[in-house]
């Protein structure tokens, strides 16, 4: 099986910037950890793919967090990614599933809802943050991220996201693309791009047919027009740790920690993103209190 990866490219002599990714393994890892049902898997997987692609636009140690909250039954979908191809995600209600929609597809819109927003927070280093948001206009997520780029980042873009789920709940295929029009692009280039996107098959179908990220970009933009700049590995990766959660406990304050010692004789923390559990003994919490008062 081909491992997940991202492709960055230019097209039409630099007038178009394009990114594509295969994310089947990463979405499968998240599905296994959270035991998501098919509709939730599709919504989470689409959000993960978009977040991963947006992360690949960052540099160095920059990272971003995306929160999708359409006020639907699934609750919030939260994903974060960095510039190195690492992504992780979770959903509030992982066991969300509905009958297929009228098109015979997983009903992501019904799960996500259409009465909320996409929020993006980019950590660009030096304690500097960029924050943007846009309303959810579709609930299918591809159109919603397209709208986010147009309104919040003023970048005309097309975002395609797809997840296919097997009858046993495992992930059959996942991936997507973000294609962006660069400033100064000719009208005829934009028209060609619009026509190509309007006539293409759904991205999940392209992946199911075995198309690689390069193949997806060639299919949309035309093989002669695509210039591959870089490929990078992608994976589900959680950076949680015993120490990070201990710092989070410290942030709760002395009174709360005293309660944990007296009433619970310790503490347990569970990472939302990966499900890992961290246990803290009474002695550890007492040492933490002592260090806070030192």
From Swiss-Prot:
This is 33 kDa chaperonin. Belongs to the HSP33 family. Keywords: Chaperone, Cytoplasm, Disulfide bond, Redox-active center, Zinc. Pfam families: HSP33. SUPFAM superfamilies: Hsp33 domain, HSP33 redox switch-like. GO terms for cellular component: cytoplasm. It is found in: Cytoplasm. GO terms for biological process: protein refolding. Redox regulated molecular chaperone. Protects both thermally unfolding and oxidatively damaged proteins from irreversible aggregation. Plays an important role in the bacterial defense system toward oxidative stress. Under oxidizing conditions two disulfide bonds are formed involving the reactive cysteines. Under reducing conditions zinc is bound to the reactive cysteines and the protein is inactive. The keyword Disulfide bond applies. InterPro entries: Heat_shock_Hsp33, Heat_shock_Hsp33_C, Heat_shock_Hsp33_N. It comes from the Bacteria. It comes from Staphylococcus haemolyticus (strain JCSC1435). Disulfide bonds join 238-240, 271-274. CDD domains: Hsp33. GO terms for molecular function: protein folding chaperone; unfolded protein binding.
């Amino acid at each position: 099986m081909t491992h997940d990866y991202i492709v960055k490219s230019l097209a039409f002599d630099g007038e178009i910037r394009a990114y594509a990714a295969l994310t089947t393994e990463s979405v499968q890892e998240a599905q296994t950890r959270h035991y998501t049902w098919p509709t939730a898997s599709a919504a989470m997987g689409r959000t993960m793919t978009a977040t991963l692609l947006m992360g690949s636009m960052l540099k160095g140690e920059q990272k971003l967090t995306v929160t999708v909250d359409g006020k639907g039954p699934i609750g919030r979908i939260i994903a974060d990614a960095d510039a190195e191809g690492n992504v992780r995600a979770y959903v509030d209600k992982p066991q969300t599933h509905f009958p297929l929609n009228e098109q015979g597809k997983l009903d992501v819109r019904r799960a996500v809802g259409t009465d909320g927003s996409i929020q993006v927070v980019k950590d660009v280093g030096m304690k500097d943050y960029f924050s943007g948001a846009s309303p959810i206009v579709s609930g299918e997520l591809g159109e919603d991220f397209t709208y986010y780029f147009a309104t919040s980042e003023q970048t005309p873009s097309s975002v395609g996201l797809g997840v296919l789920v097997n009858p046993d709940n495992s992930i059959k295929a996942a991936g997507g693309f973000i294609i962006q029009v660069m400033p100064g692009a000719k009208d005829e280039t934009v028209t060609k791009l619009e026509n190509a996107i309007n006539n293409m098959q759904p991205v999940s179908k392209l992946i199911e047919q075995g198309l690689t990220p390069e193949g997806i970009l060639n299919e949309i933009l035309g093989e002669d027009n695509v210039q591959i700049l870089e490929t990078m590995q992608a994976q589900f990766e959680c950076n949680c740790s015993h120490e990070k959660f201990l710092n989070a406990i410290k942030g709760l304050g002395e009174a709360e920690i005293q309660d944990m010692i007296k009433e619970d004789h310790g503490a347990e923390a569970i990472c939302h993103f990966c499900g890992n559990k961290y246990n803290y003994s009474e002695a550890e919490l007492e040492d933490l209190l002592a260090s806070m008062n030192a």
